[in-house]
C-alpha cells in the first residue's frame, strides 16, 4: 500500500486500575509522575510527534477525567485527541476505542498501552513500513532470553524450551477493519480471556508479522517499575539545541516599520509580502531550525496570497507550536537588529515584552539588541534592515 493512501489511528489503552503498582491513594499508574510528567503524557507526546495527522483516542476509566483533562490541555493537541470510557476488561476497552475511531476513514490502527512511555519513533516507523509492504498485522516482540521453568506449587516440574518464544509488546498494529471485525466477533462469541490484540487477530485467522521490539519499551506494572522509570528520566542528558536565523528586507518610502511586532514611526517602511517584520522572520527560522522543520518559506510561501500583509506574529507563534509539538521547551530567544535607523533603544523593552507574549516565555528569556553597520553596505546606505536571531530549545532528554 502506498504511504499516501495509508491513514493511521491510535488507541491508547488507559482504563486500568494498576492494583500491583502501589496503594490506591497513589492513583492509577498511568497518571503517576516520571521525569516531571505523567506516564501517559510521555506516551501521548511520542505519538503526537510521530504523526501530526493521525487521530488518537484515549480509553480511560470513568473516574479519571480530572486526572486526564489537565494532561490533554498541556499537550494542546485540540481535536486530534479524543477520549472514550473503557470497559471492565482491556478487551472491552480496546473495542470501545476502535469503535470511537470509526468515522475517521482509517486504513490502519496502532493499539498501545498507556503505561509503555518509552516507545520510540523508530519502532513506529518499522511498523508502518511493514504495513506498506503488505503486512496485515504487526507485533513488536523480543525473543525470550531467560530460561523458562514450569512449576507446580513450590517445585520445578520441567524446563520449557525458549526456542521460538517471544515476549509481546505494544503498539500492536493492524488493518483497521480487520481488527475491528475481530474484536466484534470476539465480543459476540462471549470470549473475554484474550490478553492482547494479536491473540484476537490469531483467533480469527489473521496473519501477524513479528518485528523487533525494544528493551526500553517496558511496561510499567509494579511500583518499582515506576520508580526506575523516574530515575531513568531524571538522569537523562538534556537535549539542548540552538537554531539560528537571518533575514533582510529592503526599505522604501513609507510611514514606519514593524520590528518584533512593534510599529515604529519612520520615514521609510520595510518591503515584503507580509508585514516584513525582519526580526520575527529571523526568529521564526531559528525556532524551526531546532527541530529540523524547514524554514519560514516552507510553512508560509510568499507566493500564497493569503499571507499578503499578514502580521508576522502568526509565523512566530506557529513556529513555537511546531517546537512544542516536537517536545521542545523554548529557553531563550535573542534578536540582533542591524539598522542605521530608526533608533531601536526606545522600543527595546516593548519588543522584549512582545516576544515574551508571542512565545509564552518569561521576559528574562527574551533579548533584543541593535547595532548600526557604520554606514557600510546596503544597511549603511539605509537601503534595508537585517536581523540575526538565535533560539535555544531543550527537547526531551536522552536516557543515559
From Swiss-Prot:
GO molecular function, one term: 2-C-methyl-D-erythritol 2,4-cyclodiphosphate synthase activity
UniProt pathway annotation: Isoprenoid biosynthesis; isopentenyl diphosphate biosynthesis via DXP pathway; isopentenyl diphosphate from 1-deoxy-D-xylulose 5-phosphate: step 2/6; Isoprenoid biosynthesis; isopentenyl diphosphate biosynthesis via DXP pathway; isopentenyl diphosphate from 1-deoxy-D-xylulose 5-phosphate: step 4/6
Binding site for 4-CDP-2-C-methyl-D-erythritol 2-phosphate: 247-249, 273-274, 295-297, 371-374, 378, 381
InterPro entries: IspD, IspD/F, IspD/TarI, ISPD_synthase_CS, MECDP_synthase, MECDP_synthase_CS, MECDP_synthase_sf, Nucleotide-diphossugar_trans
Record site feature (Positions MEP for the nucleophilic attack), residues: 162, 219
Region named 2-C-methyl-D-erythritol 2,4-cyclodiphosphate synthase: 241-400
Keywords from the UniProt entry: Isoprene biosynthesis, Lyase, Metal-binding, Multifunctional enzyme, Nucleotidyltransferase, Transferase
Positions contributing to a divalent metal cation binding: 247, 249, 281
Necessary cofactors: a divalent metal cation
Reactions catalysed: 2-C-methyl-D-erythritol 4-phosphate + CTP + H(+) = 4-CDP-2-C-methyl-D-erythritol + diphosphate; 4-CDP-2-C-methyl-D-erythritol 2-phosphate = 2-C-methyl-D-erythritol 2,4-cyclic diphosphate + CMP
Family annotation (Pfam families): IspD, YgbB
Residues of the site described as Transition state stabilizer: 20, 29, 273, 372
Organism superkingdom: Bacteria
Stated role: Bifunctional enzyme that catalyzes the formation of 4-diphosphocytidyl-2-C-methyl-D-erythritol from CTP and 2-C-methyl-D-erythritol 4-phosphate (MEP) (IspD), and catalyzes the conversion of 4-diphosphocytidyl-2-C-methyl-D-erythritol 2-phosphate (CDP-ME2P) to 2-C-methyl-D-erythritol 2,4-cyclodiphosphate (ME-CPP) with a corresponding release of cytidine 5-monophosphate (CMP) (IspF).
NCBIfam families xref list: ispD, ispF, PRK09382.1
UniProt family annotation: In the N-terminal section; belongs to the IspD/TarI cytidylyltransferase family. IspD subfamily. In the C-terminal section; belongs to the IspF family.
Name under which the protein is recorded: Bifunctional enzyme IspD/IspF
Amino acid at each position: 500500500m502506498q504511504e499516501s493512501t495509508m491513514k493511521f489511528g491510535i488507541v491508547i489503552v488507559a482504563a486500568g486500575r494498576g492494583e500491583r503498582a502501589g496503594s490506591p491513594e497513589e492513583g492509577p499508574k498511568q497518571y503517576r509522575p516520571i521525569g516531571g510528567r505523567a506516564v501517559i503524557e510521555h506516551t501521548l507526546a511520542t505519538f503526537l510527534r510521530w504523526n501530526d495527522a493521525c487521530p488518537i483516542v484515549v480509553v480511560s476509566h470513568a473516574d479519571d477525567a480530572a486526572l486526564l483533562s489537565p494532561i490533554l490541555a498541556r499537550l494542546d493537541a485540540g481535536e486530534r485527541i479524543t477520549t472514550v470510557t473503557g470497559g471492565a476488561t482491556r478487551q472491552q476497552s480496546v473495542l470501545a476505542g476502535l469503535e470511537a475511531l470509526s468515522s475517521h476513514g482509517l486504513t490502519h490502527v496502532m493499539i498501545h498501552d498507556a503505561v509503555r512511555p518509552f516507545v520510540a519513533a523508530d519502532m513506529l516507523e518499522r511498523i508502518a513500513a511493514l504495513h506498506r509492504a503488505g503486512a496485515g498485522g504487526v507485533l513488536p516482540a523480543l525473543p525470550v532470553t531467560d530460561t523458562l521453568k514450569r512449576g507446580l506449587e513450590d517445585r520445578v516440574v520441567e524446563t520449557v524450551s525458549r526456542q521460538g518464544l517471544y515476549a509481546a509488546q505494544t503498539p500492536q498494529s493492524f488493518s483497521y477493519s480487520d481488527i475491528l471485525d475481530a474484536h466484534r466477533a470476539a465480543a459476540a462469541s462471549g470470549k473475554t480471556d484474550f490478553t492482547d490484540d494479536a491473540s484476537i487477530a490469531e483467533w480469527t485467522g489473521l496473519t501477524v508479522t513479528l518485528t523487533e521490539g525494544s528493551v526500553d519499551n517496558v511496561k510499567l506494572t509494579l511500583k518499582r517499575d515506576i520508580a526506575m522509570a523516574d530515575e531513568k528520566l531524571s538522569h537523562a542528558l538534556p537535549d539542548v539545541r540552538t537554531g539560528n536565523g537571518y533575514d533582510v528586507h529592503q526599505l522604501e518610502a513609507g510611514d514606519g516599520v514593524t520590528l518584533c511586532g512593534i510599529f515604529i514611526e519612520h520615514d521609510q517602511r520595510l518591503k515584503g509580502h507580509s508585514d516584513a517584520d525582519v526580526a520575527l522572520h529571523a526568529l521564526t527560522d531559528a525556532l524551526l531550525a531546532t527541530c529540523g522543520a524547514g524554514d519560514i518559506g516552507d510553512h508560509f510561501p510568499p507566493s500564497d496570497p493569503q499571507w499578503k500583509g499578514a502580521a508576522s506574529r502568526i509565523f512566530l507563534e506557529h513556529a513555537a507550536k511546531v517546537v512544542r509539538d516536537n517536545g521542545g521547551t523554548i529557553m531563550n530567544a535573542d534578536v540582533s537588529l542591524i539598522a542605521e535607523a530608526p533608533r531601536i533603544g526606545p522600543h527595546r523593552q516593548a519588543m522584549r515584552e512582545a516576544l515574551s507574549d508571542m512565545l509564552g516565555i518569561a521576559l528574562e528569556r527574551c533579548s533584543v539588541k541593535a547595532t548600526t553597520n557604520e554606514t557600510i553596505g546596503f544597511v549603511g546606505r539605509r537601503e534595508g534592515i537585517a536581523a540575526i536571531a538565535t533560539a535555544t530549545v531543550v527537547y526531551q532528554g536522552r536516557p543515559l
